[in-house]
Amino acid sequence: MKNLLYKELKLCVPLQTWIFIFLSITIMIPSWPSLVSFFYPLAGITVVFTLSNANRDLLYTSTLPLRKKDAVKGKVLLISFLEMISMLVSLPFGFLKLFLQKGLPEEQIYPELGFNLALYGFVFLVFGVFNLICFPWYYKKPEAKVTLPFLISDLVTILLISFIMAVFILFPEFASYVNSYELPNLLTQIAILLGGLLSFLGFTFLANHLAQTNFQKVDI
């Protein structure tokens, strides 16, 4: 699988996607909602599938000594890898956000999810939902236009992000709670992080299984 992931990275990830992946650094903007920074990587992932279709990547992969389900697994690994990269890249810039916020007047800092462990739990959830929608749908007709599966996936994740953001903006006490590192608050952050991680793993595993099932029915 390492070789397959390497092949995916070399042939299916254009410069535009890397730019979108690294836009998670916008988390450093003090007045910018932290969770929004992780929508950009998902927007860039669409380009991966567009390029794959343009290059007839599925046809090429089918000539390799691989099972059809391994071709799906390779793409799932690639997208999951890119999602993890976007999270890792954001970490130092999240700390920079906290530093920059210290110099702002209190009235310029509005209640939001902020930068903490809970944030990444929700990011895991958002990424998992995206994977669960887009992979099974895409692999029903992988060589058709890829617009609709990713348009719907992006729309659902935007709605999910908006809902999560709205909760913390409308209920400032929630924002204050998750941005505190006292023991009960920290335990809540850890619980949200673990819950999000389990959701991501479960949704992505299910997405991979459903996508493999759909792809087995496709005649390349």
Model-derived features with residue positions:
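Alpha-helix N-cap/helix-start motif at helix boundaries, enriched for small hydrophobics
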Residues: 70-72
